[in-house]
């Protein structure tokens, strides 16, 4: 009888430990402020760019061939400049990230190195927010930390944080996942792409720059010399030097802005909490 009680106690303890378990993934520095992450596919380690503004998770054609996946079809995305990106697809691929296995029904297949300078270290793919569509994650990018939460740890993580005004967007084909943060200005809401991969300045469209009174003639190639502007993010006032550019969004948050806060993203409930 005592043995049974001990076994039941051990099983209960294991379940409690598991319920509080988090998977903390360490991000690695790349060029400028960009981050990479180790992704294992069929036991082999690859170097993926972690990009919250990446829209689609992609693998290189080389990986698809190594794991004998058929490359097929066509998918279309847009860079913030409006440039069209054409890619293909592959199905049924599992990633191991930290201790977490994530199954992808479909991923994009495209060679990211085709748009990067030749001297950049090789990138094998892009890990976008789409990979976490069934999860709750916490991003503390200033400390190079990505946490995959469970239901219990997520409640603890959200505690003390404020809810952000956001939109979750799935792109023109319904196959992407991006987050836009609503930033108020003169009784209107402007929507900024949540883009950790933007290692440059916070960007304003030409139209938004007029609202924030950022004159093109005051800009220099060295944006650090540009004037500061104020952006209200949730209950926080962010003062940062933006740059006006011909882009397809109202604006694009950058690494510098995102690194000032800690974000917990609940994809199922489409909520973003931050502090």
Describe each PLM feature range.
Residues 20-275:
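Pepsin/retropepsin-fold aspartyl endopeptidases
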